[in-house]
A protein has these predicted regions:
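Sec-dependent signal peptide recognition
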Residues: 2-10
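Hydrophobic alpha-helical membrane-insertion segments
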Residues: 11-12, 164
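N-terminal signal peptide c-region/cleavage motif recognized by signal peptidases
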Residues: 14-16
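Surface-exposed, glycine-biased beta-strand/turn segments
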Residues: 19-93, 101-106, 120-123, 130, ...
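Conserved beta3 VAIK motif of the Hanks protein kinase fold
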Residues: 97
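A solvent-exposed, charged loop/short amphipathic helix patch at secondary-structure junctions
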Residues: 111-122
């Protein structure tokens, strides 16, 4: 019980600091904001740790980096996020973009090489800070319907603690 109280106290104290780090973030899509899923929903087989942006039942909308950082990981899987991009930001937070229909051409080439090298469709590739830097607004892929998705949308998460702690950034206003 003491551990739970300590964790809650830490989160309460740090919330204003975490909120400040996303004051200047932009929307990842050039569409009116409309959510089909929110943080904290209990799904039949998991806790929903992000938000789902509607894309009007269509795929292929440009997905933008919400802040400066670097692409630290991409993943491809027939389940979960499907095609996913992970951006590490310079303040220690991470944004995750899931169910993409495609990556940028440079990332797509790396993914294809890795798939052939591993003789596997599913891959997870980590990158160093200097390989794929991104600026706020850069296109990192296209919205889609890959992985465990019930329809076209963009799944996005914000994680703290070096990418290990999903957080409800919508609660910050």
């Amino acid at each position: 019980m003491k551990r739970i109280f300590s964790l809650l106290a830490l989160l309460t104290i740090s919330a204003p600091i975490l909120a400040q780090s996303y004051d200047n973030a932009i929307c990842p899509l050039d569409l009116p904001i409309s959510l089909s899923g929110t943080y904290g929903e209990l799904r039949h087989n998991h806790f929903h740790a992000g938000v789902d942006f509607r894309t009007g039942g269509q795929i292929g909308f440009a997905v933008h980096a919400i802040k400066d950082g670097y692409i630290s990981k991409v993943s491809v899987s027939p389940t979960g996020y499907g095609n996913g991009v992970y951006i590490t930001h310079y303040d220690g937070t991470m944004s995750v973009y899931g169910h993409l229909s495609s990556f940028t051409p440079e990332i797509a080439q790396r993914v294809l090489r890795e798939q052939y090298s591993n003789e596997s469709f599913s891959v997870s590739i980590n990158f160093s800070e200097d390989e794929f830097p991104v600026k706020q607004g850069d296109v990192i892929g296209k919205s889609g319907n890959t992985g465990s998705s019930a329809g076209p949308h963009l799944h996005m998460e914000i994680r703290e603690e070096d990418g290990n702690l999903p957080t409800n950034y919508l609660a910050w206003g």
